[in-house]
C-alpha cells in the first residue's frame, strides 16, 4: 500500500467562484459560518454576514455589515477581503488534507499579518490541515513571529523554511525561534 497523501488531499488556494462555492457548501454543512465571518472581521470588525448567491456568475458573494443595508459584493471591499474569504473557506474545505497558498500576504496590509496568521494556524488546527504558504514579505514573517510571541502554545504548529538556490536544502527555523530571528533582523525569507 502507498503511504502518504494522495493528490485529492492537496488543495491550492483558489479564487475561482465555483471552487469557493463548493468550499462554502462545506462550511455550511459543518456549521462553521461564524469562523468565516470572524476571518473577515480581521479587516472590518463591522462585518456580520457572508452570503453566496445561487446562479450568478458576477458578484456572487455578498458581505453584510451591522446597521448597513444592502449587503455589498465582496469585491467592494478589496483584494484582501477576497483573500481572507478564500483562505478561511479553504481551511474548512481541506479538512484532513494539505493546503498550498502562494504569496499568502498579497492584498493584506502589514498591520493585519499577526491576525491573518492566527486565522491560518487556528483554522488549520481545527480542520487538521497542513498549510504550506510562501511569501517574500518580511512583514508577513514578522507577523508570524508576533503571533508566536503572543501565543507560545502555537510555536510547535509553525515553522519557516528558508529556501535559497545556493543551498542544497532548506534552512528550517522552528516556531519558537521565529520571534528571535525577527528581533535579531535575521533574514528568513
Segment roles from a protein language model:
Residues 118-189:
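C-terminal lobe/lid and adjacent interdomain/linker elements of RecA-like ASCE P-loop ATPase modules
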Residues 95-96, 129:
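Short coil/turn segments at beta-strand junctions that form active-site/ligand-binding loops
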